[in-house]
Amino acid sequence: MADTATTASAAAASAASASSDAPPFQLGKPRFQQTSFYGRFRHFLDIIDPRTLFVTERRLREAVQLLEDYKHGTLRPGVTNEQLWSAQKIKQAILHPDTNEKIFMPFRMSGYIPFGTPIVVGLLLPNQTLASTVFWQWLNQSHNACVNYANRNATKPSPASKFIQGYLGAVISAVSIAVGLNVLVQKANKFTPATRLLIQRFVPFPAVASANICNVVLMRYGELEEGIDVLDSDGNLVGSSKIAARHALLETALTRVVLPMPILVLPPIVMSMLEKTALLQARPRLLLPVQSLVCLAAFGLALPLAISLFPQMSEIETSQLEPEIAQATSSRTVVYNKGL
C-alpha cells in the first residue's frame, strides 16, 4: 500500500509539474532556494503576505485537505504545483507547525506589518510626553513578545517564566533608554527647539534595538550554556555546540538590530522633508495619514529584508567548532537552526 501511495503521489506531482510553471512541489520545503539572499527574500515575502489574513475557514480546510491528499498519495488528477504551493502557504501562515492550532491573527507573521504599523506610528509621534513614551514602548514590546510566543518552537516544553523574563527585560530596557534619552535631549540647552524635536524623533531606534538584543539574550542564554544541535549534510544529529549557539545568537541579534533601523530611522528623515512642503504646511491634518503611509512602506520593505539576511539553517565549518564535533563527523560543514 505504501508503494502504491508513493507511486500515486509521484504521478500526481508529475502531472502538476507538466501543467504549471511553478517549481515541483515539496511538502514542508520552501518554494524558493534558501542559499541566496533573493531566494530567502521571496520566501519571506510569502510568509508575511497579509492577504492570508483574509483566508476563510473553508479555504483553510480545503488547503489542509489538499496537502493531506498529497501526503497520502490520493491527490485528485489535475492539481497543479501552484495550487499545492498556495495550499502550503495558507496552512503555514495560519496554523502553528507544532501544535496545528490557529495562531491569533495579530500575532501571525502575516499580521506583523498590518498590526505593527500603528505601533510604529505611535513610537514616532512628535512632542511625546513621558507617559506616551512609556506607553508606546510598552505596547511595542508586548506585541513583539506575543508574536515570539505565538510562533515559538513548541516541540519541547518551555517554562513560561523564560518568556516572562525576556518580556520584562525588553520592556524595562526599552522604556528606560527611551525615557533617559528624552530627558537628556530636553536638558541639552545648546540645541534649538527645532533641533531638539528632530533628535527626539530618532530616540525610539536605540531604545527598540537595545530591547531586542536584551530579549534575545534573556530568552536564549540557556543555549550558550548547553549548546544547540548541529546537523550534517544528511540531516543527522552530530552533537551540541556552544560555539554554534554563539553564532546563532549573534545572527539573531544582528537581524533584530537591522529590522527596526529603516522602520524607525527612515520615516523621521522622510517626514522632516515632507513637512516643509506647501501641501502639508497648508493641510496639517494630513501629517498623521502621510506619516502612517511612510511607516507602512518602511515596515513592509524592512521586515523581509532583515529576516532574509541569514538562512534559517545556517552553515558553519566543523574546524570552527569544538574538537569533539569535528571528530564526530566526516562532513566539512554542519548546519544549525539560528531561530527567529
Swiss-Prot record:
Coiled coil: none annotated. GO terms for cellular component: mitochondrial inner membrane; mitochondrion. It catalyses: citrate(in) = citrate(out). One of its GO terms (molecular function) is citrate transmembrane transporter activity. It is found in: Mitochondrion inner membrane. The chain crosses the membrane at residues 103-123, 163-183, 254-274, 287-307. InterPro entries: Mtc. Mitochondrial amino-acid transporter. Transports citrate. Does not act as a serine transporter: not able to mediate transport of serine into mitochondria. In brown adipose tissue, plays a role in the regulation of UCP1-dependent thermogenesis probably by supporting mitochondrial glycerol-3-phosphate utilization. This is Sideroflexin-5. It comes from Homo sapiens (Human). The gene is SFXN5.
